[in-house]
Amino acid sequence: DGSQRGTTWQATPGLFAYRRSIAKEVLGTDDPTEVQSHLSDWDKFNEVAAQASAKGYKMLSGFDDAYRTFSNNVDAPWVDGTTVKVDPNIMKWVDQTKEYTDKGYNNKSSLWDSQWAADQGPSGKVFGFFYSTWGINFTLLGNSLETPVAEGGKEEVGNGIYGDYAVCEGPQPYYWGGTWICAAAGTDNTDIIRDVMQKLTCDEAIMKQITLDTQDYTNNEKAMEEIANSDYASDF
């Protein structure tokens, strides 16, 4: 009906996070620009999957790793009146998943299960993972460590495969996730809630600091451009 129901501080562009060491063995390079040239469409991606398999690696961990990349590129909604419509791009994902499973290009895991997490760690032999920006610091980093932070490990090169990941765009643009802030209906703190929501999602300085503090990607273009053009970086 045109009324705003929530707001968010995040932008959640998708990317492909790959193991530098594996890319170098399979493709002869770990440079993000060069790796992207090998993965810039699905035909090329599938070719690299075959190359990775020949070297003893899986291209993806599980059945649903690539799902969002396909599902974010459909042409129409799932439901039309009382009819459920399966977009051709979804069927491309089904076909690819069957091929990868039959040929051993994936490890038959599912998102968030223990095998999927282990495949991102020191013993993993998976070329890469489709992730959004939040997934790098909130999930992939922790899974990469040999000794978890909770057990005294440090987030630093030398602990597991910390530092062995790089990212590129992958075969198709997509997004994954986004956390939204909503006010409770009937609240008696309207002014305070409005101020909190506006500050967290509209204040350039605050949004820039969120990224600097947590590595979360915020939806303020100017703030993100300033960080991109600075010397800010992550050892991970």
Where in this protein do the model-derived segments appear?
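Extracytoplasmic/periplasmic substrate-binding proteins
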Residues: 72, 91-198
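Mature extracytoplasmic/periplasmic domains
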Residues: 174-175, 179-236
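Short, solvent-exposed loop/turn and secondary-structure capping segments
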Residues: 8, 28, 72-73, 140-141, ...
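Charged, glycine/proline-rich intrinsically disordered loops and linkers
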Residues: 28-34, 144-158, 226-236
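Secretory-pathway/luminal and periplasmic proteins that interact with or process carbohydrate-rich
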Residues: 53-58, 129, 205-209
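Helix-loop-helix "hinge/cap" segment bordering the ligand-binding cleft or interdomain interface
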Residues: 2-66, 78-111, 185-191
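Short aromatic-enriched loop/helix-cap "lid" or pocket-rim segments at secondary-structure transitions
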Residues: 67-76, 141-142, 222-224
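Short catalytic/ligand-binding loop motif for oxyanion handling, primarily in non-cytosolic enzymes
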Residues: 15-16, 67-71, 136-140, 207-208
